[in-house]
Amino acid sequence: MKTVVAAAAGDAGKLGVAERLGIQSDMVVQELGWDNDVDDDVRAAIEEVIGSDLLDEDSDDIVDVVLLWWRDQDGDLVDTLVDARAPLADNGVIWVLTPKTGRDGHVEPSDIAEAAPTVGLAQTSNISVSDDWAATRLASPKAAKSKR
């Protein structure tokens, strides 16, 4: 059973997003695909939980989690997932954050479902992280089985 640390009432929503993403203190998290449209509250909540800044695309560190902000016009998802997977620890996960249905840049869930196995990843869950963004969890099949 997980132990959840209580937060002040005003912080509960934003800190909860990091918990829903499975992000814990001292994890190393890399952010890819940042642009002006990302949800800064989601970013701030994750940074607060991990106790450091998110690593950018130029980092060479091994990471526990990759946050990939992805929009329909961003190019080839398979190529980007190959790049995102490179620094990932063996049991690491990639969260593909996409604009929700009806929002500019919305990505069809089938696009993610088709791209994931091409690069050796399994889609394991989907969650809402904010009013405008949804997240899809991708992991290696070995990591996916251990989290079920």
Regions found by a protein language model. Give the residues of each.
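S-adenosyl-L-methionine-dependent methyltransferase catalytic core, i.e., the SAM/SAH-binding region
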Residues: M1-R148
